[in-house]
Amino acid sequence: MLDNRPFKRLLLGTALALGLIGSAAAADLQPLRVANQKSTIKALLEASGETRNVPYTIQWSEFPSASPLGEALNAGAVDIGALGDAPYVFALGAGASLKVVSIIHSEGRTTTALVVPKDSPIKTVADLKGKKIVTGRGSIGHYLAIKALATAGLTTQDVQFIFLLPSESRLVLDNGTADAWATWDPYTTVVTSQSQARVLISGNQLLSNHLYLAATSQAIADKRPQLDDFVARVDRAYAWANTHPNEYAAAQARITGLPLDVHVTVAKDTRLNPVTIDDAVIRGLQATADTYQQEGLLLKHIDVSQGFDKSFNAKRVPFNQASR
C-alpha cells in the first residue's frame, strides 16, 4: 500500500501556515512534546499569548537544567527543546539524532560572565590559576570558563572545577568555597546586584550567545507541521519580549522567585533576535565541539554540521542576522 503520510503532512503544514486548518484537521496533528527549562520557552510563549489558538496540543516537560533536557531529547522522550552551544554539543556527542531548527541570539548586556566576590584579590583571568571555579558541568558557563582561561594561556588543568546547579553555585561563591562562578543571566545580574560580585570577564566577546531549538529527527519526520508552527511562534514571542520587557520580566519572576527588578534589568538590556541557520553558525558550533575535544571532555571528533536543518529557515520571520 502506498504510504501517503508525507503528502498528508505537507497538506497539513500548508493549511496550518495559511491559517486554514479546522478542528477536524487539527485532530490529525499529534501532540508536540516540548522540553522546558524554568522561566524559558513556556513562560515566554504564555506571556506573549502564543499558547492561544494552537491547533495541536503542546505537552510540556520541565527540566532543571540543560543537561537532563539534552538527555531527554537523546532518549526521544521529548520532540524539541532549547539548549545553549555547549549542552547541544554534548547531546550530539552522546549520539543524539537531533537537528537545530531555530536559533535565537542574545545581545546587549553581560548575558554570560565569570564573576568573583567583590573583595576578591583576583583581578585578572590569569589570577585564577590554582583557584576553584563553580559552574554547571557541560553548561554554557563551563564553556565560558574554558574560553576565558584560554585568553590567559591557562587550561582546565590549571584550575579546579566545582559542578553545581545555579541555585547552589551562588552559595559556594558567597561562602568562599569557590573563588569564581561562570554563569549566565539572570544569575549574573542577581549576584552582581545583591552580592556586589565583580565581572572578571564577560562572555560577550568569547561566546556566540546563541540559544538553539533542537528537534529530534523522528519529530521532524512525523511532526513537521507542528514544528514549523512552533518555531514561528517562538520567533514572534521573542520579538514581543523585545518590546514588552516589563511584562516578560513579570512572567519570569513569577516562576523563578527571583526579584522582579532583576528580571526587568535583564529584559530591558537584552535584545533577542532570530538567526538564520547558515555555515557561519555551524562553523562557530564546530569550534565549540573542537574545544571540548581538545580539553578531553569529548572523547571523539564530532561533525556538528549533521545537527542542523536549514530547511526551517524558510518558515521563520525575516532575519536581521546578528553577529556571530
Task: Explain the meaning of each model-derived region.
Residues 293-324:
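Conserved C-terminal helix/tail region of periplasmic/extracytoplasmic solute-binding proteins
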Residues 27-155, 160-163, 179-182, 200, ...:
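Short, glycine-/small- and polar/acidic-enriched structural segments
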Residues 43, 71, 75, 89, ...:
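Solvent-exposed, polar/charged alpha-helical surfaces in well-ordered, non-transmembrane soluble domains
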Residues 11-21:
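Bacterial N-terminal signal peptides
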Residues 222-299:
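Secondary-structure end/capping motifs
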Residues 86, 161-162, 167-254:
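Pocket-lining segment of extracytoplasmic ligand-binding domains
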Residues 104-116, 194-219, 231, 270, ...:
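Periplasmic-binding protein-like
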Residues 2-12:
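Bacterial N-terminal signal peptides that target proteins for export
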